[in-house]
């Protein structure tokens, strides 16, 4: 399953991303509550439809505060310009066997690659 980050969704909502459309059709895409939260805070065309559609995708698990701190320490994620949301997404994907993260954020992509969960979708 692929967790699609907010950066990819925003680009897709402005101009259809063919690869994402195909992955959605193959039921390979999952979501995360914090990605939905970030999108909900933005200005979206057809906001209710978009949020409802993304909310209906399979959801990646969330991690606890203690799990987040263990991830940050275990993978030395501090000082890399990541946000708390970024760290939560990394931890959530790491919990899913075969899970990968698709992002356009360079720092988040580098951290995902270091952990072994980066998607080149």
Q: Model segments located where?
A:
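Short, well-structured N-terminal submotif of metal-dependent ribonuclease cores
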Residues: 1-35, 40-52, 58, 118
């Amino acid at each position: 399953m692929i967790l699609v980050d907010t950066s990819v969704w925003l680009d897709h909502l402005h101009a259809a991303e063919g690869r994402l459309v195909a992955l959605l059709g193959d039921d390979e895409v999952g979501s995360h509550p914090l990605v939905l939260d970030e999108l909900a805070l933005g200005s979206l065309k057809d906001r209710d439809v978009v949020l409802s559609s993304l909310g209906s995708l399979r959801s990646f698990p969330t991690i606890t505060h203690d799990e987040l701190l263990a991830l940050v320490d275990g993978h030395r994620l501090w000082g890399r310009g990541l946000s708390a949301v970024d760290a939560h997404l990394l931890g959530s994907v790491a919990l899913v066997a075969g899970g990968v993260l698709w992002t356009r954020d360079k720092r988040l992509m580098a951290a995902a690659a270091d952990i072994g969960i980066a998607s080149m979708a």
